[in-house]
Regions:
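Intrinsically disordered, low-complexity regulatory regions
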Residues: 1-74
Length: 74
């Protein structure tokens, strides 16, 4: 999704993957939920709504994958 489109997400290991590997599941899912809340609460106030909703969707997909016990897709 969003990560595949942006040039700065082209490194070998992404920070989000490192976080998933090193954090407890509860902490990692809390981080993802917090980012969803952040982007929902500022929708239309910072970046274009389409950019912010893309971020919301990305974090929601990652949360869904984490809940299912999967590694994140980028």
């Amino acid at each position: 999704m969003m990560a595949a489109l942006d040039k700065h997400y082209q490194g070998e290991v992404q920070p989000i993957q490192l976080m998933q590997a090193q954090m407890s599941t509860e902490a990692f899912q809390g981080f993802l939920r917090g980012n969803i809340i952040k982007y929902v609460s500022r929708l239309g106030k910072k970046d274009a709504p389409t950019k912010e909703t893309a971020k919301i969707l990305q974090y929601a997909v990652w949360l869904h994958q984490s809940v299912k016990g999967e590694e994140l897709t980028l």
